[in-house]
Amino acid sequence: MKWVKSGVGILGILLIICHAVTSQRRILDITDNLKITFKTISNFGPRAQSIQNVTIENVGIKDIPDFGWRCYFCHDQLLFPGTFNLARSQYFLRPILDNYVVLSDGFLLEFIKGCMYRITPIPRNAPIKTRDKREFTLLAEQFSVSKYDSFPNWYCETISGGNTEVANIRSTENLKYVEDFDSSYNWFRIPHDFRSVPLQPQDRYSANHKASSVEECKYKVIPTPVKASVRKVQRNFGTTVYYGTTDTSIRGKLFKVAEKLALKHKLGLVEMTPGQPVNNGISLVVTGNYIERNIPSPDEAYRLSVSADLISIEAPALPGLINGIETMHSLSAWDMALPYGGVKDFPRFPFRGIFLDIASNFPGYNYMMKFLTVMAQYKLNKLVLPLYNNEGFRLELNDSPGYEFQALHLVGGNRCHDLKEENCLFSQLGSFAGNSDGYLTKGDMVDLIKTADLLNIEIIMSLNIGESARGAIVPLKTSKHNRLLYDPEDTDFVDRFYPQKDSSMNPCREETMIFYDHMLKQLKAIYKAASVPLKTIMIGSKVNFDQVLNSKYCYPKNLNSTQRLMERENLERNINGFKLNFTKRLVKTAHDNGINEVMAIDDVFTTEFDAAGNTPNTVYDTVDSETNKTRFNATVTAVHSRYDTVRDERLWKRGDRFAELGYKVIISPPILDFNYAVEPDPDRPGDYDSVIRNISFSKLFRFVPDSHCCNIPNAIQHDCALESDCTTAGPPDSYIGTLGKLDTRKLRSLKDWNELLFPRLLIFAERSWHKSSWEDSFEPHRVRMNNITRQIITNYTVPNWNDIIQEESKVLGCISRKEKLRLMHEDGLKPYVEPPGARLLGGNTMRIAASTTEDSFWVQASVNGNPWTDNVKVLDVNPTDSVRLRTVHPAKAELRSKEVKLNLTSLPTPREQFRKIAQDALSRRIGIDIQRARMPPMPVNPTYRPPVPLPSFDPADDRAPDLAAIAAAHPPPLPPGMPPHMMPNMPFPPRPPFVPPLLPPGQMRALGQQAGQALRGQGQQTGQQTLPAQPRGPMGLTGQAAGTGVAGQSGQQPSAAGQGTQQGLPGQQRTGVVPGQWPFFPGMPAAQFPPMFNPQMQRALQMRGQGQIPQTQGAVAGAGQSRVPQQQAG
């Protein structure tokens, strides 16, 4: 009998195993054989939406059934916004289609959470037969001009007998499934967007590039010292490191710094008394005496001298000594020998920081160690780490086995396919379907803090106590303790780009402050374990006030509907008082935990729009005007990062208002966002928005930290605003530094991180440490009136371009020649390398000339797939040849650029053709052909032409204004759905005028017809079909309420500002385009042109006429006015 029972048991086990194998084989039959293709067709779809096409092909030998499976993918934008019910956070057409959009070819689309969507085949439709293709079209809320807007690792699941199997779709493991961007329809974000056109080799060619020499770069230190004098005579490091100090409190730390230096160069180590004569080595002395007193950071100053007898580094404090050691390493990097001479140096700012987003995508402990080393090399001294955001929680707060909140890192630090999110956060941002991602252990963080302390780097933790906090909220709600930090009865709408109510902490729940206090205590314990004091904390996001107004926790209990309405009205009137009290409580809690410095994004310390006339430009005073007492019992620092315009409020003015009202100010304008692309290349990593397409090396080099009227994106010239749009500068010592930022939501690999960070991090370090003489030539533009003609004239200031270009050429040249090799050799980090340029030479034979802006690099060429030819200057080719080029370092073959293909025709490149359009436009014909065909002449001035300040324009020249800004600021917006350069009554063309055909005419014609159907089909509500056998609508859409909106929505919801990000700094949204209007472009005086050419002015006049804009502005209690007499802060 026993053997019978045993046999039954074995049979059961075998059946289970067979079922598991069968299920796994079934899912692999689907995921291995589904070929996904994704294509952005046009960014000029209905209501300025992006039209995107998805093709699903069965490349296997078996049919794929139409039931039993469904697939998931991440999309960074809201899809089909016209049919999305924000209040319910789901699609809604009618009850039978609740939460679905019916796509063509038999699929349903469903929003899940975060960026995740699910497509499900409609049962009884038809299986996908071998070599069969299914297509459907997506409408995305914003434009898309990069492959990196898409995410890899689509995956599918099968459900059989209650068991779920998941597997990644093999064809989407990288971004090769995204088709090329190949015309102005998917290059352009808005009409006239010439700077978004990708560069061709002909556009890069520079026949007169002045390369830096070895002698110029051999002893070039980046960042540039204040004073340096070196000679060609050299010496080695000697035999011993001597160290000494009169300050016994730092003796142990000085020993560790000296020991690290001795081990690196294999030298002896001897402690000495300051003043003791030594020779044949390196002398490290902390004197305690200031080298310079009237400088922002005297402790970081140092003096380095090199003679035949000794290498001497002296500093008043340990930070300066560490800076001196890094300068010594830079001087000796070329051949491990030091030149005779001396350096005297100190920084322009005490705060030179990087905000590194480790929460969205986790880089790992080893990478962070390398990053600290690079920061020290280039004298950056603050590292801000967001511990969590919507995408993850990245720190083990406590390693005790019984720690009650282990779910924070165990759930928040991992992603997998778990819809209930009990074991991990739901898969997102292209993560694998299986468990992926990671977090720092407590021991890892202790090591990082210790290492940073010896490198003169302070690690500052950023906490999101407000929006963008889902990585902390979800683990706590799913843990056994069930700590809710939000209101589960609230509506789902919290953030348009993250439509889930559990992504924002509720300030009215006491659990939120308990969590915040717990985080501070745990962090303090971690710093204590590293023997480093926790001095500073950062608040990385503001409160979501939609949540405050809707949550029951923000009102007294047991209110009837009338009382609740009255309380809501009172709260809405006093919302800025509520915000101030919550901010004060955050600062007080930090101070109570022994933290005396609190940083926060600028929105935390400013008001919201209210009936009293307060705006985001109204800054809370640090002193209470009624009691004359300090509001905050800790030092408060505002990270000034918003330089956009909201309802005609110029937010770049806030920096001076912070300084005037007692805050320390760190400037962090958009030009310091390293997540922006290096160049407008759809194939390379990097983000963008409607204002900034890319930030080049030259653009970043011209960053002027001391100018409070410049560094403003898309100001009409040189990123400087009008003098009237600038405020009186606050106390100079209130501006304490700069903060660069890297948002990693779209960066799936460390290769992408490195490409965006390096070498731009070095340029940022140069501007943050060293002030160049030409910086003062960046000034605001001045407006005056001609007393005779009464005409308003703008005098545009011109920077000192000769000095700028000369210094830029030397610094960027030495970065290529020396620093990129240092990054590869010493740190193992591969920086971005610019591709080469080339052009066709005239003559009887076809020849090409090649060049590169990367000093000491070669151009390599491959013809028809043959091996690469080194150091190409001139190359003979045939017209039918396929020529590929790349830039490569002769000593480091892995240090190379992407490959580019050279078009062997004499036709101008798209950029060259657009340059001609731009030159015509700048001849005071901006939009003339389009405008005259579209609208009658103006009755007041039929010959009017919008003003243009510069006589010439080159789309690749950062010094010139952006024509997209000019064209968008002046003409009325184009009708929705109108592609660039369209005339009325024209059919949708196979390509825009002036753009060479980049596809065969047949394909382009089909593309045009397909998009034309979409445009003509708008306004038809097609959601009246039944589920089985869905007929195909325009552009392959069914179930899309395109024109009128649904479920109580009046039309399509207006687009929120920017493509969504919860991490810019966290909680900050990038500037975007609202359908039907253009962003404000500073520096364009409104009085120079009629209102109809300026949508902002027209809208403002209409609002004032309707009484929506008050003539006088009041101030909320607690919203401070400037204490500078001639300047108001309201």
Curated annotation (Swiss-Prot):
The answer, when asked if Glycoprotein is one of the entry's keywords, is: no
Q: What is its main location?
A: secreted
Q: Write out the similarity annotation.
A: Belongs to the glycosyl hydrolase 20 family.
Q: Name one Pfam family in it.
A: CHB_HEX
Arranged from A to Z, the UniProt key words for this protein are:
Hydrolase, Secreted, Signal
Q: Which reaction does it catalyse?
A: Hydrolysis of terminal non-reducing N-acetyl-D-hexosamine residues in N-acetyl-beta-D-hexosaminides
Q: What is this protein called?
A: Putative beta-hexosaminidase
In short, the EC number is: 3.2.1.52
